[in-house]
Amino acid sequence: MSDDSKPLFSRPVLAAVMLFCTLAIWLLNLTAPSSKLPTPQIEKWTTTSGIPVVWLKQAEWQDSNKLELRFSFRSVTTNITLIQTTLAMLMSDSLPLSTASINQRLAPLAASADSYYDHENQTIGLTLSNEPKYLTPTLSLATNWLRQPDFKPRTFDAWQTQHQANPPVQHELENVLFFDKTNDQNNTTTTVSLKQVSDYYQSLKSSAATIFIVGEMSPETKQTVKNAINAISQDYQLSNASAEAIHYESISSTIQQNEGELWQTRSAIALVPVSSIKEWISLQIWGADLVSTLNQQQHIDFVQLAFTLSPQRPWAWWNIQYANSITETVSQPSYDASRFISAKSLVFVEQVPSVNDKKAFDTLLDNFKQQLEQQTLSPTWWSYIATQVTHEDGALTVEQFAEGYKDAIDSFTIEDYQTALQHLLKPSSYQEIQVYQ
């Protein structure tokens, strides 16, 4: 008969089991699956004209034929209309001896072109196939196009007629946030001539920053691309531009346009330049929280948010579209006025929900990680990071981002978030345009 009072294990054995369990838990935590994020490899060289080239590649792209090429420029100017018009003309029928747009010409070659601009950065992009039957003719066409584009008067006149009277919201907010407030704020359009467009495109060549290549290249493909880049950039010069002359408005203000019901609120705020990956993560979570929080307001239809993370004068802007009748909405018995959040509220760190609610923060961070696991597999996303988030002459380069973003994500805490927002946001610069109709 067994003795039920006898312990199953002796004390030394029990101590050993407990120690083993503790070590096992520690090892499991140590080896717990972290974010499934790839780390791109980076190779660098310079063109024959001295322009830096950065090539990003990763194992996940070995079977992909997608290649991204980005020509990044640093032409600092307050004349945003001139930048917009020049790049729009470039994307039109600017290929010499052609009446088709550049994308119409590139489409049969499984390629496309695009552009990006802000008050400090400009980018001309090509998405192309690395297959030789497409690659060679695409690069030949791109070389002819970018070396000496032909800006046609008829196309210029048509574009001016269509766009001059309705400048983008981005331009309007930049004028309010950054430019001389003594100017007429109702005059957000700037007259641009075709000669100015041609001259500005030539000036871009003297403002080159970096050329980025993202995607898989065989040794033969790499040499073909290098030759094309050398040809395109043979008269490029490195930029020495500075945004020190551009100052953001340090006193918050609200501008009202038209009369009637409140239709839109357009907001802008200056930011401190992003100098670390955790600061970039913080802005992404803050932005997601801002959009989600405002979208939950009964009187708001939808919210759009965008970041311009330029190297010296970054900023954020968002556009709120209100319900058809905001007055009726806020006067309904079901409307909870105590939960009203204004367009300006979330520029103050202490009023950001995810700063004060750990659960809300964790949810936003988890959602961000899931999105990132998909985005980081895309060469296009890495092209965006290279040209619009990191800066080769700034505090955060694409190489630093690629090497450190996984660890930054995995170790990111709410304390990191709170500290970063306190540093990044400049509430005193907040500018608001209320549009009535």
Give the location of each predicted region.
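His/Glu-rich zincin catalytic helix
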Residues: 2-105, 206-299, 432-437
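Charge-rich, well-structured scaffold segments of protease-associated domains
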Residues: 2-29, 104-240, 301-437
